[in-house]
A protein has these predicted regions:
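Short, Lys/Arg-enriched N-terminal segments with co-localized hydrophobic residues
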Residues: 1-11
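Alpha-helical coupling/stalk and coiled-coil linker elements that connect catalytic or binding modules
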Residues: 9-439, 446-476, 498-499
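ATPase nucleotide-binding head domains, primarily ABC-like/P-loop NTPase cores
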Residues: 80-81, 262, 383, 389-608
Length: 608
C-alpha cells in the first residue's frame, strides 16, 4: 500500500513539475515579447514624429525630395508593423499555452472550472448521465474535456453518453489514447491553436453549406468570358489613353459600363457570399488544426486512419481549406474602397465567387470526411490528456463473456487523492448482484458512483482509477437520484417506477445490462417498499441481469440465502467508538450491523 502511494506521488509530482516548468518558461517569454512589442510601438511613434519633422524642415524643397523622405520613413514603418503583428501573434500563443498549463495545474488540484462541463448535456431521461454527474460543474466530462471545436465537443460528449459495447473497438480506442498520451506537445499545440479562435455551435451548420449549396455562376459562360474580357479591355484603354490614341472620355464611358457590368450579378454574388462570409476565420483555424495532424506519423490504427482521411490527390486538406478561407476573405472585402475599385476594373467579385463555387464542386464532398476526422482527433486529444494527467491510472482488460467486472482498489476520479478511500468489486458471472447495506453517510452512494464512473471510462477506452480492472462492456443503466417532475406532473415514486419498468423491458428484449440502483422504491411505505424490492430483485435475477443495489433495508440481505449463487452481501459500517461516530468507507462482506439515525438524533438533542 505504501509503495503504491509512493508510486502515485512520484508520478503526479512529475506531471506537476512538467506543467509548472512550462508556466514559468512561457510566462517569462510572454513578458519578453511584451517588452519587444512596446519597443516597436515606441520606434513607430518616433518614425511618425521624424517624418513630420523632416517634411516640415524640407517643406520648401522639390516634391521629389519630399517623396524620398516619405519613402525613407514609410518602408521601415511598414516593416515594423509586420514585425509587430508577428510578435503579437506569438505573444497570444505564448500566453494561451501558459494559461492552459495553469489550468491543468488547477485541474490536478480538482479545480476544472476553466474547462467546459457541457451542462446542457445532462438529462434525467438518459440511462446514467445525471446519476453519475457526467456533465456540468465539477463533472467527469469537465475534468476530461479539452476540445477546441464544437464538433469535437459533441463527439466526446457522444462517447460519454453512448459508450462502446464492442471489445475490438474499445481496444482500438485504448491504443489511440495510449499513443496520444505521449504526444504532449502536439496536444498542447492543437489546443492553443484552436482556443485562440474558438468556434461555436453554428459552425457545423455553416460548414454543411459547403456541400449543399448549388452553384449559380460557374456554369454561366458569359460571366466566365467577361472576367477575362473586361480586364483586357481596360489594359487596351489605358495604353490608348497613355499614347493619346484614345480620348479620356472613352475611359470614362467604359468606366460607367464596367460599373454596371460589375454589379449586374450582385444578387447572385450575395447568395454565394452570404453562405460563407462568416466562415473565413473558423476555416483558417480548422486548416491550422488539420495541419497539426498532417505533420505527424501515427502508429495506432485509429490515429493512422484519421490521418489518412486528410489525404486528397497529392494535396493536403489543410492547404485546400486554407485556400477556401483565402477566397472567402477576398470576397469579404467586396464593400471596401479597394474592393469596389478592383471589382470595376477586373470583376473581382465575380471572379472570387466563381473560385468559391469551383472549390465547392471539387472539394465540397470531402469536407464532411475531413471535419469528422478533425472532430475525432479533437475528442481523442482530450482522452490522451486525461491519461497523461493520471499516470497512476490503468487501462482495463476487456472480458469476452457477459458478465464480468472484477477490480482492485477502485477510486472516484473526482475525489481528492488524500481522502479517496478505494474499494474492490467482484462480479464474475451472470446473473449476479451485489447488495450493499449500510448506514447514512457510510459511503454506499459514493461506491456506486465510483463503480459507474470507472465502468464508463473503461467502456470509452480511457484509463480508470484502479489498481486492476477487468470488465465486460454491457449497457449501463442507473437509478440513483430520480426526482419529481412538475412539468410532466410526475411524482418521485412514479418517475422511479418508470425507470425500473424501462430496465425490465430492456432485459426482456434480450439486452445485456449492467444495473446500478440506490435505495429503490423510496417513495412508498416501508412494508410496501420491502415487498416491492424483494419482488424486483427476484425478477432481475430471473432475467439473468447483473449489477449492484444499495439499500438501508436489511431484509434484502436475506436474499443471499435464497440465491447463494446469484447474490452476495456487502456493507459499509458506521462505527461508534467513545460515543463518536466514525466511518472507514471500506467495503466489507456481510450485512450492515450498525445504523446511525437514532444515534445522530440523540447527539443533536432530539428525543428518541
Amino acid at each position: 500500500m505504501v509503495s503504491s502511494f509512493l508510486f502515485i506521488f512520484a508520478g503526479m509530482e512529475k506531471i506537476y513539475n512538467y506543467y509548472q516548468d512550462i508556466v514559468t518558461a512561457y510566462t517569462r517569454r510572454a513578458d519578453n515579447l511584451k517588452k519587444k512589442i512596446h519597443l516597436l510601438g515606441s520606434i513607430r511613434l518616433l518614425l511618425v514624429a521624424g517624418l513630420i519633422t523632416m517634411v516640415w524642415f524640407f517643406k520648401s524643397e522639390d516634391w521629389k525630395v519630399l517623396a524620398g523622405i516619405a519613402v525613407l520613413f514609410t518602408i521601415p514603418f511598414i516593416a515594423l508593423m509586420v514585425w509587430h503583428t508577428k510578435l503579437f501573434a506569438r505573444k497570444c500563443y505564448t500566453e494561451a499555452l501558459a494559461n492552459l498549463c495553469k489550468n491543468e495545474l488547477n485541474g490536478l488540484d480538482y479545480d476544472f472550472s476553466a474547462f467546459d462541463g457541457a451542462p446542457e448535456k445532462s438529462s434525467a431521461e438518459h440511462s446514467f448521465s445525471l446519476d453519475l454527474d457526467l456533465f456540468g460543474n465539477h463533472s467527469l466530462f469537465q475534468s476530461v474535456n479539452r476540445t477546441v471545436t464544437f464538433m469535437g465537443k459533441e463527439k466526446l460528449a457522444g462517447w460519454f453518453m453512448q459508450p462502446l459495447t464492442d471489445k475490438a473497438m474499445i481496444l482500438r480506442r485504448q491504443e489511440a489514447i495510449r499513443e496520444l498520451e505521449s504526444f504532449t506537445q502536439l496536444r498542447q499545440h492543437f489546443y492553443v491553436t484552436g482556443i485562440l479562435h474558438p468556434g461555436n455551435k453554428d459552425d457545423q451548420q455553416l460548414i454543411s453549406l459547403l456541400s449543399k449549396t448549388a452553384p449559380c455562376l460557374i456554369n454561366n459562360k458569359i460571366w466566365k468570358l467577361l472576367i477575362c474580357l473586361i480586364p483586357s479591355i481596360w489594359v487596351l484603354v489605358a495604353i490608348g489613353c497613355a499614347l493619346n490614341l484614345l480620348p479620356v472620355s472613352i475611359a470614362g464611358m467604359f468606366f460607367g459600363l464596367s460599373f454596371i457590368i460589375a454589379y449586374l450579378n450582385a444578387k447572385q454574388i450575395a447568395t454565394v457570399h452570404n453562405s460563407l462570409d462568416r466562415m473565413e476565420q473558423i476555416l483558417q483555424t480548422y486548416s491550422e488544426l488539420i495541419k497539426c495532424i498532417e505533420g505527424e506519423n501515427f502508429q495506432s490504427a485509429e490515429l493512422a486512419d484519421i490521418h489518412n482521411r486528410f489525404a486528397s490527390d497529392g494535396q493536403t486538406a489543410s492547404s485546400i481549406i486554407k485556400k477556401l478561407s483565402g477566397h472567402i476573405g477576398a470576397l469579404n472585402q467586396r464593400f471596401s474602397a479597394i474592393g469596389v475599385i478592383l471589382n470595376i476594373f477586373t470583376l473581382r467579385d465575380t471572379r472570387m465567387a466563381i473560385k468559391l463555387e469551383k472549390w465547392k464542386m471539387e472539394h465540397g464532398e470531402d469536407t464532411e470526411r475531413w471535419f469528422e476526422a478533425l472532430a475525432l482527433f479533437d475528442a481523442y486529444c482530450s482522452l490522451g490528456g486525461f491519461a497523461f494527467n493520471h499516470p497512476e491510472y490503468i487501462y482495463p482488460e476487456i472480458a469476452d463473456v457477459y458478465f464480468k467486472m472484477e477490480g482492485k482498489a477502485l477510486g472516484h476520479p473526482l475525489l481528492r487523492r488524500d481522502i479517496c478511500v478505494k474499494n474492490d468489486i467482484e462480479i464474475r458471472k451472470s446473473p449476479w448482484f451485489l447488495i450493499i447495506t449500510g448506514a447514512n453517510m457510510a459511503g454506499k452512494s459514493t461506491y456506486l458512483r465510483t463503480i459507474g464512473v470507472n465502468y464508463l471510462l473503461g467502456c470509452i477506452g480511457a484509463p480508470v482509477c484502479a489498481a486492476s480492472l477487468t470488465l465486460y462492456p454491457a449497457r449501463m443503466v442507473t437509478s440513483l437520484r430520480t426526482s419529481d417532475s412538475l412539468a410532466s406532473n410526475e411524482s418521485y415514486f412514479f418517475a422511479e417506477l418508470k425507470r425500473l419498468k424501462m430496465i425490465i423491458d430492456r432485459l426482456q428484449q434480450g439486452e445485456q445490462l449492467f444495473i446500478i440502483l440506490d435505495e429503490i422504491l423510496k417513495g412508498t411505505n416501508s412494508i410496501d417498499k420491502q415487498k416491492g424490492s424483494l419482488a424486483l430483485m427476484k425478477q432481475l435475477v430471473a432475467n439473468q441481469a447483473c449489477g449492484i443495489i444499495a439499500t438501508h433495508d436489511l431484509a434484502l440481505g436475506e436474499l443471499e440465502k435464497e440465491f447463494p449463487n446469484q447474490i452476495k452481501n456487502y456493507r459499509f459500517e458506521a462505527d461508534i467508538q467513545d460515543n463518536e461516530l466514525t466511518f472507514s468507507y471500506q467495503l466489507r462482506e456481510g450485512i450492515a450491523q450498525n445504523m446511525n439515525a437514532c444515534f445522530l438524533m440523540k447527539k443533536m438533542g432530539i428525543t428518541v
